[in-house]
């Protein structure tokens, strides 16, 4: 995930939803 999932958990989950 670009930007680092550790920094933004919410964005990480959102991106994961888009990727999957």
UniProtKB/Swiss-Prot annotation:
Compartment list: Secreted
Activity regulation comment: Strongly inactivated by diisopropylfluorophosphate (DFP) and to a lesser extent by tosyl-L-lysine chloromethyl ketone (TLCK).
Gene Ontology CC annotations of this record: extracellular region
Keyword Flavoprotein included in the entry's annotation: no
PTM field: Glycosylated.
Tissue expr: Expressed by the venom gland.
Its EC number(s): 3.4.21.-
Residues covered by the Peptidase S1 domain: 1-20
Activity at various pH: Optimum pH is 8.0.
Keywords: Blood coagulation cascade activating toxin, Glycoprotein, Hemostasis impairing toxin, Hydrolase, Protease, Secreted, Serine protease, Toxin
Enzyme class: hydrolase
Any one of the GO BP annotations: proteolysis
GO molecular function annotations of the record: serine-type peptidase activity; toxin activity
The UniProt record lists the keyword Zinc: no
Oligomer status and interactors: Monomer.
Known function: Thrombin-like snake venom serine protease. Releases both fibrinopeptides A and B from fibrinogen (FGA and FGB) to form fibrin clots.
Family: Belongs to the peptidase S1 family. Snake venom subfamily.
Name listed for the protein in its UniProt record: Thrombin-like enzyme okinaxobin-2
Organism: Ovophis okinavensis
Lineage: Eukaryota, Metazoa, Chordata, Craniata, Vertebrata
